[in-house]
């Protein structure tokens, strides 16, 4: 599959009241707000436009100092980041066919090539949404509920996403305390692409039981019968920042560069 550059915009959902790391977008990483570093990754990927969608004036004010980054002030009632981005798309006035890359606000090390790749994957697939995955090679990642796992069908489309270790190896996991994950285990990367029109359709879908149990908004798409294309990327995506421990790890990684 050719993954040449296709036109796309990037939208970054950002909320202040993250339960595991309150004020996350404004937490400092290397002396700068986390949201700054994420937005700059989007700019480096060559997006036509970069928007931060937030309901918090503190985040909006922090982003205002970044050249080339727009802010969409959204409602504080959205159930998910994708719901927030649907409002952002209306504010920005994007064409329904415009490819929108949803870059999570906790991905300060997202490689530019990976951002471009997910846009190209959507362009070349017949799926409603596209995302990326990478292989898991550490047992602590496989069993970490903050690291989302996924399984795919033979056509490279997502079957399910879970915080649990899927697929479950019945013969190994039940008997080995810390098995080495040699096999088909994949870590989901919090990066999505869909067109602006599908974002609006997303808002009409009711959150299903699976989404509510796992607290994973992408399951709403699968539960509604839509398809998500998945590419196993060679690009290195460090895990996102969800907890104070993740932030400390990212700080150390930045110091080691």
Swiss-Prot record:
Superkingdom per UniProt: Bacteria
CDD domains on file: CMP-KDO-Synthetase
Catalysed reactions, semicolon-separated: 3-deoxy-alpha-D-manno-oct-2-ulosonate + CTP = CMP-3-deoxy-beta-D-manno-octulosonate + diphosphate
GO cellular component terms attached to this protein's record: cytosol
Principal location listed in the UniProt entry: cytoplasm
EC number(s) recorded for this UniProt protein: 2.7.7.38
Molecular function as annotated in GO: 3-deoxy-manno-octulosonate cytidylyltransferase activity
Subcellular compartments: Cytoplasm
EC supergroup of this enzyme: transferase
Pathway recorded for this protein: Nucleotide-sugar biosynthesis; CMP-3-deoxy-D-manno-octulosonate biosynthesis; CMP-3-deoxy-D-manno-octulosonate from 3-deoxy-D-manno-octulosonate and CTP: step 1/1; Bacterial outer membrane biogenesis; lipopolysaccharide biosynthesis
SUPFAM superfamilies associated with the record: Nucleotide-diphospho-sugar transferases
InterPro entries with a match to the protein in the record: Cytidylyl_trans, KdsB, Nucleotide-diphossugar_trans
Signal peptide location: none
Keywords from the UniProt entry: Cytoplasm, Lipopolysaccharide biosynthesis, Nucleotidyltransferase, Transferase
Pfam families listed in its UniProt record: CTP_transf_3
GO BP field: CMP-keto-3-deoxy-D-manno-octulosonic acid biosynthetic process; lipopolysaccharide biosynthetic process
Entry similarity comment: Belongs to the KdsB family.
Primary role: Activates KDO (a required 8-carbon sugar) for incorporation into bacterial lipopolysaccharide in Gram-negative bacteria.
Designated name of the protein: 3-deoxy-manno-octulosonate cytidylyltransferase
Organism: Xylella fastidiosa (strain 9a5c)
């Amino acid at each position: 599959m050719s993954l040449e550059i296709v036109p796309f915009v990037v939208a970054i959902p950002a909320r202040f009241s993250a339960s595991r790391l309150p004020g996350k977008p404004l937490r400092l990483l290397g002396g700068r707000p986390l949201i700054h570093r994420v937005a700059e990754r989007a700019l480096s990927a060559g997006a036509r436009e970069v928007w931060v969608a937030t309901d918090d004036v503190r985040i909006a004010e922090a982003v205002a100092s970044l050249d080339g980054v727009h802010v969409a002030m959204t409602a504080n009632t959205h159930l998910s980041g994708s719901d927030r981005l649907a409002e952002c798309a209306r504010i920005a006035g994007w064409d329904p066919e415009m490819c929108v890359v949803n870059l999570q606000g906790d991905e300060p090390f997202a490689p530019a090539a990976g951002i471009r790749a997910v846009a190209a994957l959507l362009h070349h697939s017949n799926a409603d949404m596209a995302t990326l995955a990478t292989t898991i090679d550490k047992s602590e990642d496989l069993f970490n509920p903050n690291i989302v796992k996924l399984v795919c069908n033979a056509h490279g489309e997502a079957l399910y996403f879970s915080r649990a270790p899927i697929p479950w190896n019945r013969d190994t996991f039940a008997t080995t305390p810390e098995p080495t994950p040699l096999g088909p285990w994949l870590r989901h990367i919090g990066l999505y692409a869909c067109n602006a029109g599908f974002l609006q359709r997303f808002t009409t879908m009711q959150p299903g039981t699976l989404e509510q149990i796992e607290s994973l908004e992408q399951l709403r798409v699968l539960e509604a019968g839509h398809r998500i294309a998945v590419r196993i990327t060679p690009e290195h995506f460090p895990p996102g920042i969800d907890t104070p421990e993740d932030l400390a790890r990212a700080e150390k990684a930045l110091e080691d560069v």
